[in-house]
Amino acid sequence: MAVGSLLNGYLEELLLAKYDKLFPVNADFTGILSDVGTIVGGATPSKKRSEYYCSNGIGWITPRDLSNTSDKFIAHGTDDITDEGYASCSAKLLPKGSVLFSSRAPIGYIAIAADAVATNQGFKSIVPKEEIGTAFIYCFLVRNKHRIADMGAGTTFPEVSGKMMKSVELAIPEQTLCAEFDFFAGPILKQQEALERENRELAALRDALLPKLMSGEIDVSKVDLTQLNSHLA
């Protein structure tokens, strides 16, 4: 798991370095965030209705879910919602590849939807325009999350509104550069998602085996490590 996390960190540095090279931070602003994607909020079904929540339904993400993981990709949080729960509120289903951005409590958690998901009202997420792509939006938010957070800092309860999020200024990327970055970033994002999945599977296996090893239910005292080493050599 440690090796996978280190590799993922290296890939993240590589991705952001390429972004910084193609899209310099000192470029003149030529548009706003709503020019490159659709800003989407979220909502919460009534907590008083147990039938609105389930363990295997529509992925529904809260800022707390992002605070509990270091993963870049997310498809499910602590709670899923049912079709009935989804229909009961104004939450919107975000397509795979949307970029989630927490807009309060706190401002600035970022993740990529690994599948279609909904969120609570603590997000102002971005559905990228096809010609812009997920990678550009993700990297832009990573590099500008503090600037965006400052926009909501003047309120009594720090929050970035939908209007604020839409108005975030940026340099509209040239199509040729967007295509180049998307071509470069695509394999990196796929590898990062695969590494995160592998880490979760290894963690689940560890958590399942460790209690059995500690209790003696599984006995490894008679395992011949010399034979194991000869197979690995």
Region locations from a protein language model:
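Low-complexity, Lys/Gly-biased intrinsically disordered segments
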Residues: A27-K72, G85-S90, A153
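A short beta-sheet element
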Residues: T62-P63, T78-N144, M151-A153, S161-G162
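Hydrophobic pocket-lining residues within nucleotide cofactor-binding pockets
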Residues: L66, M165, M214
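Juxtamembrane "helix exit" motif at the C-terminal ends of alpha-helical transmembrane segments
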Residues: K72-F73, G216
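Non-catalytic DNA-recognition/assembly elements of restriction-modification systems
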Residues: M1-T44, S55, A171, Q175-E180, ...
